[in-house]
Amino acid sequence: MSDGLNSRLLRGSSRRKVYCKQPKCQNHLWLWLFFFNLKTNYMTEYIPGLAGVPATKSSISSIDGEKGILAYRGYSIQDLVEHSSFEETALLLMNGELPSPQELTNFKNTLNKRNEVKRKIRHLLWSLPSTGHSMDVLQTAIASMATFYPDAGASEPDSSYTQNALIKIISNMSTLVAMWTRISRGYDPIPPSKTMTYAENFMYMCFGEESDPEIVNLLDASLILHAEHTINASTFSTMVTASSLANPFASIAAGVGTLAGPLHGNANENVLIMLDEIGSPKNARKWIEDRLKNKQVIWGMGHREYKTKDPRATILEKMIKTYIKKNGLKLSNRFETALEVESICNELLSQKGVYPNVDFYSGILYSEIFNFTKEHFTSIFAMARSAGWVAHWHEQVSDNRIFRPTQIYIGADFRDYPAQ
């Protein structure tokens, strides 16, 4: 096989498709080469974005896109949201099994013990422009943590030193995100508590007061829903970096940078911008029809893995409705507009398998109920996803082979340097 081929092997064909760019291959012709493998037959073809291409074996999470099921280590997210906590879910993702009560208590204590950010990193955050995006700040801070843990590496992923570094990442994520919500607005950070839960502590560090337990429970559920989602772009980025045997801080920093993109974690910010642009439910149909006519994105709609509604979106929508009804609140204009957008998109796009994804309702939850500004949405997403990234880092380096895909070369043929 040519080293310049980005390909997928498909069972059931006796033909291999090879793109030749050597000078002797005039007009860059496709060559059909027939071959026989003793065990099976394969065909290779270029797959843009590696869509649907198996890149690894993993036991961390799974998706049934037809039925709309997401499970962590075999447990459905519905069950985890109803019965678990973010701390327990993080430990499940990391270790593969639900912890015992004592193991969970020990883990919570360790998270709280390690939730303070190093003084020099605190100074680093203060030195950055307050206008900086939270994801750029978070990526910088996570990468800098490696300088304090030089021996946390892939060569001994199960050592107590490396395991403590992994826990430090999860623990510091919430502190770093909360610090920037305040520093970016000119306020002093609030030191983390040593007794609160992960979700409770985050709200306290952001707002300086203990939050309503109902709000804390909603945040905890949201963190569970965002903790893991198989091989998405940011997780794959983390894995690719880990496959070079990079330290966990460099690998998770790569994931943070990838999550910042508008086609990934940043999408929930764009959903809120979209809803504000639509303005009210009565404007939704024309706005959507115009977008479809011009082949433009409708933010928060559609997911490559799901042929039905994203189960996380279903849970988030239900959570918001339950909270509003229980507290006798009026539907916000944004939420009413979102419901109308979903209704119209179901009418126009459901036959194409396009339904709301997790980003469609998460921004509303963050802004309308938690009172976070949209600039911090994606960093809160990263805070939750750190549990999944850490689990994938460990899984990757424990049975590693460096990722080295191939490509299809479409540049100039071999040529001589011009004579002087």
Predicted regions and their residues:
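N-terminal, intrinsically disordered charge-dense segments
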Residues: 2, 6-19
